[in-house]
Amino acid sequence: MSFKKVSFAAVAAVCLFLGGCTQPRTTQIELPKSALDSVNLPNEVAIAGEKFILKQKNARTAEYYLPNEKVGFKWTKLVSITVDENADINEYQRTFMTALKSGQFGKAEYDFKSINDKEYQAYTIYYPIAGNPDFDNYEINLIHVKSLNCGLRVTHYALKFLNIADRSKFHALIKQKMPIFLAQMPQVECK
């Protein structure tokens, strides 16, 4: 018998013995509930005349990409919806602002504007990070955060610009796009 066959047989026997694979189990493993299960998510979103398709989601965040763009960092425009069942809106804002001020996400400009005690709007302008191919462009995020009965809903509309873009035009663009985003963002509500 070859060494590979003997090694495999020994490893398999140890796994069966130590893993208890020889006896059937009746224990059910229940996966954690997704925060997104508590809201009605659309499959498509339209903002500024462009259609975004739900292409990726995890337990807390759904990402919508343009039809011809792939999941990952090479998108040009992106819509995302995050639901956090346990977040406090004020603590969320403080934590986000602290991270921005610290430079955790690289150099950034930002502004937060309270709408009322249950919602606010914000924008971020992230600067390119030299040498990082995933973050080598400017990125503008228009953000709306609202406290719902089922958790905190955070909606982002993100736009990327080449690292040679004229930064002086970003604030005018934000002023133009923010009302469109707020009027057309998906109205995701609790189930």
Write out the residue ranges for each language-model feature.
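Bacterial N-terminal signal peptides that target proteins for export
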Residues: 1-10
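C-terminal motif of bacterial Sec signal peptides marking the signal peptidase cleavage site
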Residues: 18-20
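N-terminal "mature-domain start" segment
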Residues: 25-64
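Short secondary-structure junctions
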Residues: 44-57, 100-115
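Secretory pathway targeting signatures of secreted, lumenal, and periplasmic proteins
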Residues: 48-88
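Short, solvent-exposed recognition patches
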Residues: 82-108
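Signature of long, low-cysteine stretches enriched in small and polar/charged residues
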Residues: 104-146
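Surface-exposed amphipathic alpha-helical segments
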Residues: 151-191
